[in-house]
Amino acid sequence: MRSFHRRRNCLTFALLLTSASAWSSFFALGKVSAESHPLAKSESSLNELSKVQEEFGVKPTDAKHDSVWHNVPGLSGWMLNVPATEAATRQARDQKLHLVWNSALPKVSLKMLPADSIYRGSPGEKSVTLMINVSWGEEYLPKMLETLHKENVRATFFLDGAWVKSHLQMARHIVEEGQDVGSHGTGHPDFKTLTEDRLARQLDVTNTILNTRLGIQCSLIAPPSGSYDGRLVRLATDRHMHVILWTADTIDWKKPQPDVILARVRNHLTPGALILMHPTRSTAEALPQLIRMVRDKGYTLKTVSDVVEEKPSVKPPETLALHPGGLK
């Protein structure tokens, strides 16, 4: 996805210079009545707005099934609402172009695909997701939450039901911090070894704990150790849940040095990557630098819920300042 903030700061929009007469009235919005404003009838102005769509708009990306990554969610795009943009600009009278964007849904969405697990998000934008599986302890969670808060990042915490009951205050703190929450089962069993009845109970019991203790209506399940089979997909689908795996494993459970975690993430940094981590000392120490590294490479961060709901992580600019030299 384009970096909208960068373009807002440096784009001169040479296209406007080729039709200065069509835009000259924008430079004196306060002197022109709404009724006589050329936006209401200027074909040239409409052509220029179409160029704004070309520059800042985003086409949706369809969901698809992949032989390696299983179900890959789609991604909604952004379409400029020209009539609403005209109306908002006329009303504002502040020498700014007020852009109104509509969500453009993919033709093929995730819900249209046959049920399957998800290992990555859409490749349609440069975004990645931090997913943190929590089944034991809370020693390193405060530092991780502090980093996420400071960096204004929302991750997805997959919480074990037994852990929630024994660390309720910390679990509630995660929710209060605005973090995304999913299910990690209860007791960290191997889902593939469970009978179907016990597997169904894993989903239901954990969902009940998350709902009654944290107020979470859970739609995500990350199987412990990534062990699952088709029964989990079917049972989760029956409960309107998505089975979530990962693209990149930090192997932080092996307690590596922070630079090892950073190297593994760097080597797997691709659009839509789901990055698996746990609340360990290594992760807590690596997290600030990891977030900076991801952003320095032009990526944004989003939650797993955003991924399965096919929400883009960045919206095009809502205003563009109008100056004789072009748009800023």
Language-model segment annotations:
Residues P189-L327:
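Catalytic domains of cell-wall/extracellular-matrix polysaccharide-remodeling enzymes
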Residues L80-P83, L105-M112, I132-E138, I174, ...:
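Short acidic/polar alpha-helix capping motifs at helix-coil junctions
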Residues R6, M131, F158-L159, L274-M277:
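Conserved short hydrophobic patches within well-ordered secondary structure
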Residues R2-L130, E139, L301-K328:
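N-terminal pre-catalytic segment of deacetylase/amide-hydrolase enzymes
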Residues A92-D190, I209, I216:
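Active-site beta->alpha N-cap acidic-glycine motif
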Residues H5, H37, H65, H70, ...:
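Histidine (H) residue identity feature
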Residues G30, G57, G74-G77, G121-G124, ...:
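Residue-identity detector for glycine
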